Amino acid sequence: MKLAFVNTADIRDARKYSGTPFYMTKGFENHGVEFSAITQLKNQLPWQFKVKRLLGKISGLQESSRFNIHAAQNYAQQVSGQLQNLTVNAILAHIANPIAYLDCQQPIVLWTDALYAGLLGFIDNFSAHSAATVEHANTLTQAALSRVKLAIFSSDWAARSALELYGVSKEKVKVVPFGANFECSHTLFDVRALLRLRSPKLVKLLFLGKEWQRKGGDIVFKVAEALHKAGQPVCVDFVGCMPPQGVTVPDYINCHGFISKHDPIGLTKLSQLMREAHFLFVPSRAEAFGIVFCEANAFGLPCLTSPVGGIGTIIKDDINGMKFALDSDVDSYCDYIMGLMQNYSRYEELALSAFNEYQTRLNWQTSTGVVKQLIAEL
């Protein structure tokens, strides 16, 4: 099978889009798929856009170059020009923009984690978009969905947005979760060894998130405090963002700041933190998917989170973690954590089950194999 992977950025750069196109491509290549990359497209905008963007800064509304019909039409021209010199079976994209106005003979496949209308009013920075940007974004998204033969989504939540908000026919909508965005060769033997290193007395929580409010950093601090007051020894490794000014950091919380997994030292540190933790604790208030939960499961690390966005497709209660409602009180978290620590064999079963979810569902080898078969059936 030969595919053309269309993207505005370089799919060979693991830093782009959290590494999703990079690891997606590697997964397909492991199944013998040959790729032609049509990437690093130029974002060409009309002069009027710059004027609108300037006016938007005054009004407080944002004109987005990412969601612009003129730019999307130009992307299509660039892609079409490069396609003329290629022989491929299908076109694959993980964002809608470059395929929204693409006319070609080959079937087009979109495999993404979210659609614009599903993010509007859900992710905070979308709320500042101007009316023109909202119109452009929905128009080009609808255009992309009308062109694709397959609309594949990483979660049931995203798939519902296609069906309910854009009226996409059920026949072309599929759900295939993304995988972990790093190299992992852990075996069940390895994970059992990791479990023997985790203390059955001191519970270690790991927070990974660059946004304090959206990722639920405040909840993590409150739960850690409650565990400490209840007499449960606790240690939190807090990675990504720093607490806001005025937030007291107790001695049982270690704030590491941002650690990049794209440099060897950072990756080694993150891997160490995941090996040592009992739970990944990221109670997000909004999340399109949550690759980090797949990555945690690769270490036999169960996840404590919330049932928002695409998380429900990744985390299954008492199988690879637990989801708590956004209005859950602190005691709900504490009771769950302490219950497992006091019956440690149950925790170990949960950790092994989490690794099984990674091995069977939440890895790129499995996911790309499923999508390859879907494309072959077109």
Regions found by a protein language model. Give the residues of each.
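Membrane-proximal helix-turn-helix segments that form the acceptor-binding/catalytic region
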Residues: 130-151
